[in-house]
Design a protein with these regions (language model features):
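An acidic, low-aromatic, low-complexity terminal/linker signal
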Residues: 1-166
């Protein structure tokens, strides 16, 4: 999903918090949600990768969305979660503070972000989503990473170095 969706359709969105804001993401690419119990740091990984986890024999890079969007925030959530999702860069884990709920929203309700807000992180923000008494920020999973970061991830060797068994 890289642009505002066509009208008259309904989206299922998962709501989650990162720092002070509530974001939403289309659940179509969501594979599962798991508790964050830590990750393995890989020295050769690009800087935007917090670490890796192995889930069902698959190595999954973890991106800390809080660190990307709010690097100035020092406090950390007690029990962060990881959204395991499909992207053009492959399967990635997005570390978030908390997951709230799933909502159904008509695409007619989506509002384009004002031009001044688009500059915060380029095309990451797709739309503003008014829902009941709240306002959510719809983000594009494909734009969590820049083109250069996607290439770096594709080229990265995320296999942890083997330890000497001597």
């Amino acid at each position: 999903m890289s642009a505002m969706p066509d009208s008259a359709a309904e989206l299922r969105l998962i709501t989650f918090t990162v720092g002070p804001e509530t974001f939403v993401l289309d659940i179509m690419g969501l594979r599962q949600i798991i508790p964050y119990t830590g990750s393995t740091t890989v020295p050769t990984a690009p800087a935007f990768i917090e670490g890796i986890i192995v889930l069902r024999n698959e190595v999954i890079p973890i991106i800390d969305l809080r660190a990307r969007l709010y690097p100035q925030l020092q406090e950390r959530p007690e029990q962060p979660l990881v959204l395991i999702t499909h992207s053009s860069a492959g399967i990635i884990g997005i570390k978030v503070d908390a997951v709230r709920r799933i909502v159904n929203v008509s695409t007619d309700a989506l509002l384009p972000p004002p031009p001044i807000i688009r500059g915060i992180r380029g095309e990451l923000l797709i739309a503003i989503v008014p829902y009941e008494d709240e306002v959510y920020l719809l983000i594009d999973i494909e734009n969590i990473l820049s083109g250069d970061e996607k290439r770096a991830l594709a080229d990265a060797d995320l296999t942890p170095p083997l330890r000497d068994s001597a």
